[in-house]
Design a protein with these regions (language model features):
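Conserved H-loop
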Residues: 28
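Short beta-strand->loop micro-motif that forms the acidic, two-metal-ion catalytic signature
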Residues: 41-44
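Catalytic core of pol beta-like nucleotidyltransferases
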Residues: 1-22, 31-36, 47-111
Length: 111
């Protein structure tokens, strides 16, 4: 299991390097049901160009990940708003039930 301090530390590292609008923890660690096999799930909301996978890989490569799995979902604020507007249940769950670990002063999503 991953300690809460390590989770917060990773969120702050993402915030420092990527300057996102928000970093949201979702999945079993956010909902209080992690197991030894649980991975860490973050939604990182930030303006960017290109495909989200490339941005996720760029961020992931800069993080000190030791012995656990990390899933990064990277979306622009516009992409998140689009998914919410069409009723994407997965995105709604992340926004409504996830834990915001970092939020910039200029965040536009979920206000």
């Amino acid at each position: 299991m991953i300690e809460a301090t390590k989770i917060l530390q990773l969120a702050q590292q993402i915030a420092s390097m990527a300057r996102p609008e928000k970093v949201i923890l979702f999945g079993s660690y956010a909902y209080g049901q992690p197991t030894d096999d649980s991975d860490l799930d973050f939604l990182v909301i930030l303006p960017f160009k290109g495909h989200w996978v490339y941005k996720a890989v760029e961020i992931r490569q800069q993080l000190p990940i030791d012995n656990f799995s990390l899933d990064l979902l990277v979306r622009s604020p516009e992409q998140v708003q689009e998914r919410l507007a069409i009723g994407d249940l997965f995105m709604q769950e992340i926004i409504n039930k996830g834990k915001v670990l970092y939020e910039s002063a200029y965040a536009r999503v979920g206000q």
